[in-house]
UniProtKB/Swiss-Prot annotation:
Phosphorylates phosphatidylinositol (PI) in the first committed step in the production of the second messenger inositol-1,4,5,-trisphosphate (PIP). May regulate Golgi disintegration/reorganization during mitosis, possibly via its phosphorylation. Involved in Golgi-to-plasma membrane trafficking. May play an important role in the inner ear development. Residues 29-242 form the PIK helical domain. It catalyses: a 1,2-diacyl-sn-glycero-3-phospho-(1D-myo-inositol) + ATP = a 1,2-diacyl-sn-glycero-3-phospho-(1D-myo-inositol 4-phosphate) + ADP + H(+). One of its GO terms (biological process) is phosphatidylinositol phosphate biosynthetic process. This is Phosphatidylinositol 4-kinase beta. The keyword ATP-binding applies. It is found in: Endomembrane system; Mitochondrion outer membrane; Rough endoplasmic reticulum membrane; Golgi apparatus. The modification Phosphothreonine is found at residues 263, 423, 502, 504. Residues 526-532 are annotated as: G-loop. It comes from Sorex araneus.
């Protein structure tokens, strides 16, 4: 990608010749491009085809299989045949391309026929425009994905596939579902363009490899079973799960069997001893031995050393959820969950991680008494907290040694000494390896967990055993802030307000025991769990949490996350102060996955059930009277988040909006969860909820009523947000449109899904017409009888208030 964008000649209708040669800077095409890729449709397809074919041919002729990146370093790849090759990041096009363009311009000017000269000038300018677009700073990852999907020319596709190397990893990762879905369901030219990048990244990142393998399996599941076995997606998944893509400098030889394998340690000893930190191959080795011993006919597929522990860890978490679903009562499910996780702790620490986290780490412990089974009628989703130790590099850092639970007290005593009482040598010793005593024990054996009989730990009344779905956040480091000087009177006033309006605790409810734990502040939860952990004294200790779901297809949730993330980025770019909270989704298969819990939040259902107050009275109870700083801040947060989610619900047609699926956090924001019914799907396909979004009279009361300034501010935000979103409609629509390819998801039922989505952006309306539309949607949603009926239906059938 060049340092400066070259401005081409102004775009003219195809029937008119360009006013000058390609280098003319009298006008700029870039202003047109900013309105979306769709504006470029005026370029002659034949000209575009020729230009891109020339680009591809020049790449082949000038560079062959050798390439360098923007910094002059070669990029090592594996091509479609698994053979090492290299590819160039075409940030700066070869000089020969520019020289030929100049020659083309010279040829045009030397022609004798005026009509031929004008036609050649026009074609040359259009070719230059397309190439300059690809080279310009405006050519971002969203535009690249759009051209990769819409273009039918191999030259364009190959060029875009090569340009993927020029974007930041984080930017490409956002579109990973789209890239893999195109690889599975589109033609070979698209797949050939995408594969080198995927293979290259899999060599660099173990977490990227895992996510690719999981998504390839999930998005291939809609194919017929006979087709699926031989599909490109299945073949690429097998390649990723093999050691072929493991970086050469990190490949480890399979360790020899430990003497412990031959000494026949008793199960009790093996249960409480750890393996050598790097001998994780014992997991895959023992698994293979167990499979072949029990069924000699089963083909022995070599699992990759680096992915086997993580895959078994995930499988065991999913198996726990499936077994919990067979139990009749929530109390039995909770006791069984605690028992299962207690056994799982005997296999930790290990070379496993939580894929939803944003930093490298090793899982060392699961505080099992803090786990909770979440509310669900037919299934058993559950939430766990996970203690991890952050590390610089997951692959090269040794797995920490296990610290027995009985060392917690002494560890805490040491921690209370000055400077934590731990020398540098002692800290380093915490990560030392221990002998491998459990090579012959399958590290994540689900069957063994099911067979063992374990005494259930006593349920402590003061422990936060239960917590509602989406009710915690991940621990983050506090940012350093400059000192702020406040008058003593302000300090006294704020302290008195804080003491007078401390958040209230919920009472224990046998039908919803999670409500009590919900009110515990996250930092307090972290402190309490850390004090009870044998690893809590370590400086790199962190607490994470994750929701494990079995029996639910999270592919629609992932699609909704992407749309919310894109809208969030658009509103930030356009400086519209709307607030939404996208939470991470990990799709494990077509019927299982993991969800990142949200910041301290309770559902509106729990608020109303526990407090027996209206939403406004609850705000007053939690944040103080109308004129306090805390209330005004919470009210503004409520308005900004309500407007943001109303637009999300309208654009995506989100259904099933009962009060159990709307959370309220400690700062006053509302957060919508559970996007299982979007676009063309609705609960039981009844299409019962007909309003554009959910806006109840209680919501309006919190805003200050229909005549209040905050209600007018809410409608203004709605208008500004819709105007900003439609400026970038293509970025939102392409996320959905690409995922429709080859999909059997309910949200894509019907042929008009994408057309209806585009219509909801109202591209043909003026801003005055949009303002009238917003007024009509707000008024219709407040008066919607179907919203009231659906809330009543949920109360009668599920007890949701």
């Amino acid at each position: 990608m060049g340092d400066t964008a070259v401005e081409p000649a102004p775009l003219k209708p195809a029937s008119e010749p360009a006013p000058g040669p390609p280098g003319n800077n009298g006008g700029s095409l870039l202003s047109v491009i900013t309105e979306g890729v769709g504006e470029l449709s005026v370029i002659d397809p034949e000209v575009a085809q020729k230009a891109c074919q020339e680009v591809l041919e020049k790449v082949r002729l000038l560079h062959g299989a050798v390439a360098v990146s923007k910094r002059g370093t070669a990029l090592e790849l594996v091509n479609g045949d698994g053979v090492d090759t290299e590819i160039r990041c075409l940030d700066d096009p070869p000089a020969q391309i520019r020289e030929e363009e100049d020659e083309m311009g010279a040829t045009v000017t030397s022609g004798t026929a005026k009509g031929a000269r004008r036609r050649r000038q026009n074609n040359s300018a259009k070719q230059s425009w397309l190439l300059r677009l690809f080279e310009s700073k405006l050519f971002d990852i969203s535009m690249a994905i759009s051209y990769l999907y819409n273009s039918k020319e191999p030259g364009v596709q190959a060029y875009i596939g090569n340009r993927l190397f020029c974007f930041r990893n984080e930017d490409v990762d956002f579109y990973l579902p789209q890239l893999l879905n195109m690889y599975i369901h589109m033609d070979e030219d698209v797949g050939d363009a995408i594969k080198p990048y995927i293979v290259h990244r899999c060599r660099q990142s173990i977490n990227f490899s895992l996510q690719c393998a999981l998504l390839l399996g999930a998005y291939s599941s809609d194919m017929h079973i006979s087709t699926q076995r031989h599909s490109r997606g299945t073949k690429l998944r097998k390649l990723i799960l093999s050691d072929e893509l493991k970086p050469a400098h990190r490949k480890r030889e399979l360790p020899s069997l430990s003497p412990a394998l031959n000494t026949g340690l008793s199960p009790s000893k093996r249960t409480h001893q750890r393996s050598k930190s790097d001998a994780t191959a014992s997991i895959s080795l023992s698994s293979s031995l167990k499979r072949t011993a029990s069924n000699p006919k089963v083909e022995n597929e070599d699992e990759p050393i680096r992915l086997a522990p993580e895959r078994e860890f995930i499988k065991s978490l999913m198996a726990i959820g499936k077994r919990l679903a067979t139990l009749p009562t929530k109390e039995q499910k909770t006791q069984r969950l605690i028992s299962e996780l207690s056994l799982l702790n005997h296999k930790l620490p290990a070379r496993v991680w939580l894929p939803t986290a944003a930093f490298d780490h090793h899982v060392v412990r699961v505080p099992h008494t803090q786990a909770v089974v979440l509310n669900s009628k037919d299934k058993a989703p559950y939430l766990i907290y996970v203690e991890v130790l952050e590390c610089e590099n997951f692959d090269t850092t040794n797995v920490p040694a296990r610290i027995p639970e009985n060392r917690i007290r002494s560890t805490r005593s040491v921690e209370n000494l000055p400077e934590c009482g731990i020398t540098h040598e002692q800290r380093a010793g915490s990560f030392s390896t221990v002998p491998n005593y459990d090579n012959d024990d399958e590290a994540w054996s689900v069957d063994d967990i099911g067979e063992l009989q374990v005494e259930l730990p006593e349920m402590h009344t003061n422990s936060c055993d239960n917590i509602s779905q989406f009710s915690v956040d991940s621990i983050t480091s506090q940012e350093s802030k400059e000192p702020v000087f406040i008058a003593a009177g302000d300090i006294r006033r704020r302290l008195s307000e804080q003491l007078a309006h401390t958040p209230t605790a919920f009472r224990r409810d046998p039908e919803d025991p999670s409500a009590v734990a919900l009110k515990e502040p996250w930092q307090e939860k972290v402190r309490r769990i850390r004090e009870g952990s044998p690893y809590g004294h370590l400086p790199n200790w962190r607490l994470l949490s994750v929701i494990v779901k079995c029996g639910d297809d999270l592919r629609q949730e992932l699609l909704a996350f992407q749309v919310l993330k894109q809208l969030q980025s658009i509103w930030e770019q356009e400086r519209v102060p709307l607030w939404i909270k996208p939470y991470k989704i990990l799709v494990i298969s077509a019927d299982s996955g993991m969800i990142e819990p949200v910041v301290n939040a309770v559902s509106i259902h729990q608020v109303k059930k526990q407090s027996q107050l209206s939403l406004l009275d609850y705000f007053l109870q939690e944040h103080g009277s109308y004129t306090t700083e805390a209330f005004l801040s919470a009210q503004r947060n409520f308005v900004q988040s309500c407007a943001g989610y109303c637009l999300v619900c309208y654009l995506l047609q989100v259904k099933d909006r009962h009060n159990g699926n709307i959370l309220l956090d400690a700062e006053g924001h509302i957060i919508h969860i559970d996007f299982g019914f979007i676009l063309s799907s609705s609960p039981r396909n009844l299409g019962f909820e007909t309003s554009a979004f959910k806006l109840t009279t209680e919501f309006v009361d919190v805003m200050g009523g229909l005549d209040g300034d905050m209600f007018n501010y809410y409608k203004m935000l709605m208008l500004q947000g819709l105007i900003a979103a439609r400026k970038h409609m293509d970025k939102v629509v392409q996320i959905v449109e690409i995922m429709q390819q080859g999909s059997q998801l309910p949200c894509f039922h019907g042929s008009s899904t994408i057309r209806n989505l585009k219509e909801r952006f109202h591209m043909n309306m003026t801003e005055e017409q949009l303002q009238l539309l917003v007024e009509q949607m707000v008024d219709g949603s407040m008066r919607s009888i179907t919203t009231k009926l659906y809330d009543g239906f949920q109360y009668l059938t599920n007890g949701i208030m």
